[in-house]
From Swiss-Prot:
The class A beta-lactamase family has a specific amino-acid numbering system, sometimes called Ambler or ABL numbering and often misspelt as Amber. A multiple sequence alignment was used to derive a consensus sequence and then the consensus was numbered taking into account insertions and deletions. This allows use of identical numbers, e.g. for active site residues, despite differences in protein length. UniProt always uses natural numbering of residues, hence there appear to be differences in numbering between this entry and some papers. Residues 1-21 form the signal peptide. Substrate binds at K230, T231, G232. Keywords: Antibiotic resistance, Disulfide bond, Hydrolase, Signal. This is Beta-lactamase SHV-29. InterPro entries: Beta-lactam/transpept-like, Beta-lactam_cat, Beta-lactam_class-A, Beta-lactam_class-A_AS. It comes from Klebsiella pneumoniae. One of its GO terms (molecular function) is beta-lactamase activity. Its EC number is 3.5.2.6. The keyword Protein transport does not apply. Gene3D superfamilies: DD-peptidase/beta-lactamase superfamily. Belongs to the class-A beta-lactamase family. GO terms for biological process: beta-lactam antibiotic catabolic process; response to antibiotic.
Length: 286
């Protein structure tokens, strides 16, 4: 009988670990900062109401990296809605227009790409030349920043083109945002009248089709969960993701996670972001 009681006690002692294998989100973020020897910025926002559910360094500046490409394509779609652009318009470019990491655009030097194809390449494959070609259509970095101001984002700024914008110097405000500002801007693009319903669906679909985000939150996503995302990476340990997430294949919340100033490898950075994502998912109903 004593042996049975000891077995039951031992089993009960393991139950909390089985129920909650991941720490609470803020505890996970603190652990990640310690393990990365860097800074983590994060916000979890309810998509419908805009209410902040979890935040850590949410008002501190972090390099945007390639996450800016979602906002860029939002600006392109706003021009489409206004009748100033067409997704079917073909853009031709030359070899000298290509920059590092252009896996899609480098294959279309002969025939060019449509505006819609460039947006798909910029978001789903993070094609840098596609982003630069699109930036030119909205007035460059200054034009994109002006668009952000027009929709009420007074924080996010783009100052340079790909690939210089990924320098990520400590304390440099250029090409930065805050988790809170990025989440609010993404919510405006996807839920307000800043974009037509058709353009909102298109922007979201490009994020659903992201093909370079596998090692991050997608790696810990349970079956039946929805995700649409865009990642970014830069020098000096910068890494980031903007995502829409939710169970029952429904986008319920916006999650923005940025890392900066860490000596960690790319694999380690990916692992920490995945860990934060796992904590959010496990404690979704907190």
């Amino acid at each position: 009988m004593r042996y049975i009681r000891l077995c039951i006690i031992s089993l009960l002692a393991t139950l909390p670990l089985a129920v909650h294998a991941s720490p609470q989100p803020l505890e996970q973020i603190k652990q990640s900062e310690s393990q990365l020897s860097g800074s983590v910025g994060m916000i979890e926002m309810d998509l419908a109401s805009g209410r902040t559910l979890t935040a850590w360094r949410a008002d501190e500046r972090f390099p945007m990296m390639s996450t800016f490409k979602v906002v860029l394509c939002g600006a392109v779609l706003a021009r489409v809605d206004a009748g100033d652009e067409q997704l079917e318009r073909k853009i031709h470019y030359r070899q000298q227009d290509l920059v590092d990491y252009s896996p899609v655009s480098e294959k279309h030097l002969a025939d060019g790409m449509t505006v819609g194809e460039l947006c798909a390449a910029a978001i789903t494959m993070s094609d840098n030349s596609a982003a630069n070609l699109l930036l030119a259509t909205v007035g460059g970095p200054a034009g994109l920043t002006a668009f952000l101001r027009q929709i009420g984002d007074n924080v996010t700024r783009l100052d340079r083109w790909e690939t210089e914008l990924n320098e990520a110097l400590p304390g440099d405000a250029r090409d930065t945002t805050t988790p809170a500002s990025m989440a609010a801007t993404l919510r405006k693009l996807l839920t307000s009248q800043r974009l037509s319903a058709r353009s909102q669906r298109q922007l979201l679909q490009w994020m659903v089709d992201d093909r370079v985000a596998g090692p991050l939150i997608r790696s810990v996503l349970p079956a039946g969960w929805f995700i649409a995302d865009k990642t970014g990476a830069a020098e000096r340990g910068a890494r980031g993701i903007v995502a829409l997430l939710g169970p029952n294949n429904k986008a319920e919340r916006i999650v923005v996670i940025y890392l900066r100033d860490t000596p960690a490898s790319m694999a380690e950075r990916n692992q920490q972001i995945a860990g934060i994502g796992a904590a959010l998912i496990e404690h979704w109903q907190r």
